[in-house]
């Protein structure tokens, strides 16, 4: 199916099957479609709502065209969300990655600069002195030595350049917002995937099952966050060994008091970094303590997804202990140090 046929189908609010979607996505990602065609297709898909088959087909093509990262480590996990929740709080899932590493987990973190928010994972890490332009081999060395490696999405998804213009001009969430967390270049099969709408939780868990994932927690909080929230119950669709279950969790389930998100919002990556360093360090401020509890909830979910813990409650307890050792803050500094060496190698 070509793009013109797909547009005619979508205009009638009819779904494409997986193979048809793969054909259209290959055209888009190989520069065979005009900006007008891409924009019209993305808007049409959003208006009718993307089907599971369509999301699977699109993700398969993005994975096929990505520059892969091979990491010789068992039970790799990712903490990557769709973004677009409009809340502008600090980089919770990125901070959680360092707690996971401090607890003995291994994180292959996939991310980008902010699109609609104030600080994307790449913005935060760059502010912390982490060099982003790494080769696949260098990313693998980060994971193996530090416990965290960062894959800067533009470096691994070069074919995305064909959709950047239409996406920017639309200025709306589109299919591509959902695809980022599903197209980790290291091929992780375990992750915490935050989404901008509760209606996406179960469908995306089904998508991840079809893409071969083993253990995934798709999360959306009732206050709108694409994270496990400190301020409201969070809906989770959990994929584990081919089965999907859905449930609600709240901080009190883990011995943590629910609190407002006041003080956790940020204006940019430097502010996010300062809050995270306080949370991972001595927690000298009230906001730093609150941020630490939010990080622990999400790191605990990642440890559970990685099967480093037997339950979500056990994962949160493990994350709590890891954060309070101070090792997580050390991991952030270690990642900055090792990537500084790689920067010198690359520029030599």
UniProtKB/Swiss-Prot annotation:
GO terms for biological process: L-tryptophan biosynthetic process. The keyword Transmembrane does not apply. Mg(2+) 1 binds at residues 93, 227. Its EC number is 2.4.2.18. Pathway: Amino-acid biosynthesis; L-tryptophan biosynthesis; L-tryptophan from chorismate: step 2/5. One of its GO terms (cellular component) is cytosol. It catalyses: N-(5-phospho-beta-D-ribosyl)anthranilate + diphosphate = 5-phospho-alpha-D-ribose 1-diphosphate + anthranilate. Mg(2+) 2 binds at residues 226-227. It comes from the Bacteria. Anthranilate 1 binds at residues 81, 112. InterPro entries: Anthranilate_Pribosyl_Tfrase, Glycosyl_Trfase_fam3, Glycosyl_Trfase_fam3_N_dom, Glycosyl_Trfase_fam3_N_dom_sf, Nuc_phospho_transferase. 5-phospho-alpha-D-ribose 1-diphosphate binds at residues 81, 84-85, 91-94, 109-117, 121. Belongs to the anthranilate phosphoribosyltransferase family. Catalyzes the transfer of the phosphoribosyl group of 5-phosphorylribose-1-pyrophosphate (PRPP) to anthranilate to yield N-(5'-phosphoribosyl)-anthranilate (PRA). PANTHER family: ANTHRANILATE PHOSPHORIBOSYLTRANSFERASE. This is Anthranilate phosphoribosyltransferase. It comes from Azotobacter vinelandii (strain DJ / ATCC BAA-1303).
